[in-house]
Amino acid sequence: MSDFVESEAEESEEEYNHEGEVVPRVTKKFVEEEDDDEEEEEENLDDQDERGNLKDFINDDDDEEEGEEDEGSDSGDSEDDVGHKKRKRPSFDDRLEDDDFDLIEENLGVKVKRGQKYRRVKKMSDDDEDDEEEYGKEEHEKEAIAGEIFQDEEGEEGQEAVEAPMAPPDEEEEDDEESDIDDFIVDDDGQPLKKPKWRKKLPGYTDAALQEAQEIFGVDFDYDEFEKYNEYDEELEEDYEYEDDETEGEIRVRPKKTTKKRVSRRSIFEMYEPSELESSHLTDQDNEIRATDLPERFQLRSIPVKAAEDDELEEEADWIYRNAFATPTISLQDSCDYLDRGQPTSSFSRKGPSTVQKIKEALGFMRNQHFEVPFIAFYRKEYVEPELHINDLWRVWQWDEKWTQLRIRKENLTRLFEKMQAYQYEQISADPDKPLADGIRALDTTDMERLKDVQSMDELKDVYNHFLLYYGRDIPKMQNAAKASRKKLKRIKEDGDEEGEGEEAEDEEQRGPELKQASRRDMYTICQSAGLDGLAKKFGLTPEQFGENLRDSYQRHETEQFPAEPLELAKDYVCSQFPTPEAVLEGARYMVALQIAREPLVRQVLRQTFQERAKLNITPTKKGRKDVDEAHYAYSFKYLKNKPVKELRDDQFLKIGLAEDEGLLTIDISIDMKGVEGYGNDQTYFEEIKQFYYRDEFSHQVQEWNRQRTMAIERALQQFLYVQMAKELKNKLLAEARESVVKACSRKLYNWLRVAPYRPDQQVEEDDDFMDENQGKGIRVLGIAFSSARDHPVFCALVNGEGEVTDFLRLPHFTKRRTAWREEEREKKAQDIETLKKFLVNKKPHVVTIAGENRDAQMLTEDVKRIVHELDQGQQLSSIGVELVDNELAILYMNSKKSEAEFRDYPPVLRQAVSLARRIQDPLIEFAQVCSSDEDILCLKFHPLQEHVVKEELLNALYCEFINRVNEVGVDVNRAIAHPYSQALIQYVCGLGPRKGTHLLKILKQNNTRLESRTQLVTMCHMGPKVFMNCAGFLKIDTASLGDSTDSYIEVLDGSRVHPETYEWARKMAVDALEYDESAEDANPAGALEEILENPERLKDLDLDAFAEELERQGYGDKHITLYDIRAELSCRYKDLRTAYRSPNTEEIFNMLTKETPETFYIGKLIICNVTGIAHRRPQGESYDQAIRNDETGLWQCPFCQQDNFPELSEVWNHFDSGSCPGQAIGVKTRLDNGVTGFIPTKFLSDKVVKRPEERVKVGMTVHCRIMKIDIEKFSADLTCRTSDLMDRNNEWKLPKDTYYDFDAEAADHKQEEDMKRKQQRTTYIKRVIAHPSFHNINFKQAEKMMETMDQGDVIIRPSSKGENHLTVTWKVSAGIYQHVDVREEGKENAFSLGATLWINSEEFEDLDEIVARYVQPMASFARDLLNHKYYQDCSGGDRKKLEELLIKTKKEKPTFIPYFICACKELPGKFLLGYQPRGKPRIEYVTVTPEGFRYRGQIFPTVNGLFRWFKDHYQDPVPGITPSSSNRTRTPASINATPANINLADLTRAVNALPQNMTSQMFSAIAAVTGQGQNPNATPAQWASSQYGYGGSGGGSSAYHVFPTPAQQPVATPLMTPSYSYTTPSQPITTPQYHQLQASTTPQSTQAQPQPSSSSRQRQQQPKSNSHAAIDWGKMAEQWLQEKEAERRKQKQRLTPRPSPSPMIESTPMSIAGDATPLLDEMDR
């Protein structure tokens, strides 16, 4: 409904002119309106339909003239909705008469302004319009053409499919001249926007329609209004004329002037929802279908049925034979139809060439004579049998639709080709001497011939895509040229004769606004515009020639060689898009590849080869490996390798497709074998075909060209063809698999419907008042239904012979057992049995049906059979049948709307009982109950995959089964009127449908009469000749029941299958059989007929073959089968040809009661069951003496139940005699969910020996088992629950896997998973025994997961992966940030205990509590202070980019302030990022939380305020420890062999004493650190392995000055690295902005200021070993450093006094070892 409202609410594109006709709003031309982009954009959208197709194909020349005249004047209307242009409207003075306004005012009670009224006609639109705008008009043009060719063509034919007597003759002519492309502008459902002509009678309805609506919707009307209503109707006939709107396909109503005052009335359109009217068939379209003399299904077909000439029929018959009957499917399908009994299995081989003629005859009947399939199958057998049976005829009917569609599309594409040819001719003839450009390909007769030879949709698409490749760019130009020529023609012609109009109308379809080039272009267009066509042509073969080589499998066309090297030639084509010869060649190869890939012949050959050779490879996804177990439908094809698609069976590929859609499998379809080694002869398809585009010469030039050609071929295959062909093949395989499912569903319904009504025993018929008028004709059935719910009553419904419910019964305790343990239950059961007995004796049903709900149904059946037997013995009731009936249909009916309406007061289970009774009475009628507009029939379970086929296809197939069967059985119209329950069959009668069928019944009801003869269908029901011919033979009249109730002549043949067209022959046969004299005056053929019906054996003497020859001689055609059919009918009128009812067999009962099928319940299946008890074998008397004595305990053991606590042997005997010995335990009794009982023998309980099963399982326990054996008669199964059987490593029980199953890939994946599991299970730590509330034996990930729910500052202590003498303390810095601190243990008693002393770096702790209190808690407190600071920001866990963006944004907002923020760093837990932006670029430094406070720039601050106060005072100071340098700065690496033991302190002291006086305090502290002064014993330890995170520490026994591997652009350490802490000593004065770059070297002498190659700056240095003994001469280093400072100062004297530069914290600074952009001192000071 929402779609309906939205489409109705869209803005109209039309206006009304002064005659009330709809006129399209004229859009201004693109070229004229270029100054107004917004309006232009609006026009672009207005000129597209909802699919983006241009509306330039619509005939509105005359309207445009009007529009152009109107452009100058404006009627002064108010503007339309926002965003739309002001509409220029003519003023209409006579739009509504004063009488009309009076009427409106009277109804509304207010004055109405008597201005102009404008009607809106809906405009279909789509959200896609905006998107398509940017693609440019060329794309829209292509889409429009594609729409023309490939959308459904119903529109064009839809107008002719329904006769429209009210349309004036000139409209019919206009319709023929309709735009061919307009027919393809379709709505979302694929239906043409142009509504067929039957959308007409909008305002008025007959009173019959209202009455019908009232019956359907249960609404009372004021019947007094009906007279007014009739007047109104008559008036409407005068008031309105109906016209087709050519522009939008809308029907509009043109009011004519009238003086008669209309009566106010609400139409049914106002009273009911459109969807309700549609589902009840009350719309105008439905009225038109009822009125039109064509079979209803002909009118409803999406592609209408059109008459055809003999030539076309021959061509079509041949095409249908080849495609539908002679071409085998790609996959293995059981193509044998279920009607082909005893025929070969493949339908394409059984149909010989003689079938073509039969198909042609069938098509002639369908298309030219409008006969429906059942009519042809029953009354034109001579023309179609034996080759075509009824299902084959349906197939012909379906393929006729496909043929018509293909033909129309071919015609449309041909017109397009002709237009393009004409356009090309005009272009060339304008300058005939000019040579053709490289990019132009002439559209010649071979292209037209190729289109003419197209035989399938695939080929048509190939031709169309080929056309688009070469001419797609010219389509807009062609349209604009056509438009210009039309304008010119219009100026020349003033009136124009008919011939001119015809030409104009033909051109009109391509009208449209001037088109611009597409704004976005594809790669091919770019290559084309760069002029690479010329180079592409020099590859040596045209695509057509290559295609012919490929088709003929030899080099029919030699490859031509261009006399120049490809690269040399490419230089001539170098341009801005393709700047190098290599790029040019790449572009040319792309063009050649695409041309080859679009060549129809190449595609045709490859398509055929691909389908023959295609291999299927399947691998499971990660989800699939986990989810697809042996119970899954995809288990057998979880891994497939090189399975030929030709070996796929039935619906297998649909399952594969479903598994792919669910993300379980990945499918790969390829033409070559995958992963097969050792097959040297198996060359790929590419290697096979490249020789056809190859020149066999050895010169370098030829080889270079060959290389280009080979690359082009490879690209054509890999990039275009293989992908498209695989997709195409996949869709075909899916279609075949779906068709297989649809066929299986049809077959199941066929088997249900083929069952005849139940017939009681002959004896019962004779004994009973079987034809008793009071009870109704037919058999009486008692249906018994019950629910699986506990203590739910049983309901019985008695149905008479006409299907009407005459009585019912409620039995509240009938499901209880007769042998129930409780006496009360037994008594109640007995009462119900007595009640049922009395009911059976009184009502005397012929059969009792019981619902097959579950296993209880067996018990009920036995009870009822016992009751019937007892009554039979007492001679109170003849022996009647008791049948178990599948209740699936009954449950569906019980829940349907129809049953609720029919039996509103009945409880659901009673409704189910009614359906059960009716089903056995006549399955056809009962199944038809659920085949309604609600599509309830799809709720029946036909096939496990029925939900995955196209719903419409499945419904059509099921409807066909109903149509076949109903027409075979015939429909008694009078019975349908008398008993509405059987009305559902009428719609399936040949020629009728839901609309015509109900209309027929309605007429008979209105006339309050029965149908007394078939001729009344014409005389009284006004049926047209075509519909009458189709349906007459299938509507039967019970002439016997009419009897004396009518005076009219009764035609006895009306009760037979004999068609009225052959009544004369039937009479002739009767007269001839009785040897009457036809010429006698008193000859009475009707009397002869009645006599023959009584003595049909007289007909056997007739020579029907001679009669048939005589008829053929008289021009009636071949009728010999018809004559034999007439004889059969006269022998037994409307004999039921269905299979007699039979009781279900054992297997059917098992499946019915368990709701299982062989696919769901089979040997080897894994199931779950509940233990119900232990099974024992009773002891035999002779075995008593075998009691065993236990020598150790002296006690005796029972040899059966193994009880071993008897002190004396006599007690064992007493144990036997008293019956307390249960016997030997032989197994376990279980119950499955489906009601089947299971038994597990003792030896299958376990792989170990089990003597006492009760020790292994308990009653009520759930156990996993595998089925070993199924006994369907006893509803039992033998099970095993041995581990070895459940695992089934040898695949003894599991379902067999596919022949092409890839066991190797499965084993490899399995091994990989096992390795992963082992890896995960392997603990990375030693479990410890430590008593502390914060200690947990968990790993790193588990600790972090626990931390998620803990508070900030909380601690977890856990084992360390470093070994048994380490622990890790993890504490929560903030949400998602956790610091892990390494703790070293010393003085351990054993590996699992806690060490006597604990060390973090060089700091000693006595126990874990001290670490928490003195180390972690202070840091947590300091961290909390920062987290609560007003300038704290989260920045996604310390994301530098986010922080920089925040600073830049804040700086922009407040340029005069220096913004600063702090955030926790996730990469380095325990550190915080301090970001600030004094000027243009943001700067970021680190603040580290330590137990003493905050460390920032080498200083410790005990409070946050102190930290930020100092920061604000010193933010401009240079960062200590950083050498200012260019962005390419690096650090000199530390000497590999340095060790703190070898520092020359004397030299260093001398050097330090000689330092200049102006050194900063930071410099001194840095130098002091070299001598080991000022060490902070409480430095934050490197709690991870130092090499992992890139900052060192002296903990953990590691070297105190490792050079760690760091991220890219990591500066390497300088030679002046300190022994204890990993930070860098500056090598130049920090205050000086001018500096040299240090050469990264291991020697301290390399100080040349040379730019460093980037590769060296990324070198990773080896970690120095702590046992290295080579010394570093620190004194020399310090001297050298002083010398450099002196030199630097001398340079500075020549310049101005240097200003302190801002901190060199710039973005481009290389990454420090800690991972930040600036190597900061506090990073090193760990």
Swiss-Prot record:
Transport is among the record's keywords: yes
Record-listed N6-acetyllysine modification sites: K743, K1676
Pfam families in UniProt: HHH_7, HHH_9, HTH_44, S1, SH2_2, SPT6_acidic, Tex_central_region, YqgF
Residues that bear N-acetylserine: S2
Coiled coil feature spans: 3-51
Residue span of region Interaction with KDM6A: 317-1300
Gene3D superfamilies in alphabetical order: Nucleic acid-binding proteins (2.40.50.140), RuvA domain 2-like (1.10.10.650), SH2 domain (3.30.505.10), Spt6, Death-like domain (1.10.10.2740), Spt6, helix-hairpin-helix domain (1.10.150.850), Tex N-terminal region-like (1.10.3500.10), YqgF/RNase H-like domain (3.30.420.140)
Keywords assigned: Acetylation, Chaperone, Coiled coil, mRNA processing, mRNA splicing, mRNA transport, Nucleus, Phosphoprotein, Transcription, Transport
Stretches assigned to the SH2 domain: 1325-1431
Residues covered by the S1 motif domain: 1213-1282
Extent of Basic residues compositional bias: 111-122
Residue positions, PTM Phosphoserine: S7, S12, S73, S78, S91, S125, S267, S1526, S1535, S1701, S1703
Composition-biased stretches (Low complexity): 1639-1664
Quaternary structure, from the entry: Interacts with RNA polymerase II and the DRB sensitivity-inducing factor complex (DSIF complex), which is composed of SUPT5H and SUPT4H1 or SUPT4H2. Interacts with PAAF1. Interacts with histone H2B and H3. Interacts (via SH2 domain) with POLR2A phosphorylated at 'Ser-2'. Interacts (via SH2 domain) with SETD1A. Interacts with IWS1, KDM6A and AICDA. Interacts with WDR43.
Protein name (Swiss-Prot/TrEMBL): Transcription elongation factor SPT6
Organism listed in the record: Mus musculus (Mouse)
Gene: Supt6h
